[in-house]
Amino acid sequence: RVLLTICLLLFPLSALPLDGDQPADQPARHMQSAERNPRFDPVKRCCPYPSCIDIPFCDCCG
């Protein structure tokens, strides 16, 4: 028991990453941006119609 107590004091359980702290659980910013889509039109500031269905952040789709 003493060894377990010492180990927990040196390495608390709160130091371990929890499920919500994993990078895979957090959405990637580059995947959400329409500007990073290769079909993005910088003049119109949107994507052509067929590809805007998959990209929720296109301004002129809809």
From Swiss-Prot:
The yes or no answer to whether the keyword Signal is present is yes
According to its UniProt record, where is this protein located? Secreted
Positions of the UniProt region annotated as Disordered: 17-37
Specify the propeptide location in this chain.
Answer: 16-45
- Name the organs or tissues of expression: Expressed by the venom duct.
For the modification Cysteine amide, the affected residues are C61
> Mostly located where?
secreted
Q: Which Pfam families match?
A: Conotoxin
Q: Which InterPro entries match?
A: Conotoxin
Disulfide bond annotation, renumbered to this chain: C46-C60, C47-C58, C52-C61
Which N-terminal residues, if any, form the signal peptide?
A: 1-15
Q: Does the keyword Cytoplasm apply?
A: no
Q: Which domain of life is it from?
A: Eukaryota
Keywords from the UniProt entry: Amidation, Cleavage on pair of basic residues, Disulfide bond, Secreted, Signal, Toxin
Gene Ontology cellular component?
extracellular region
Per the similarity annotation, which family is this?
Answer: Belongs to the conotoxin M superfamily.
Domain comment, in the record's words? The cysteine framework is III (CC-C-C-CC).
What is the name of the protein in this document? Conotoxin reg3.7
Q: Which organism is it from?
A: Conus regius (Crown cone)
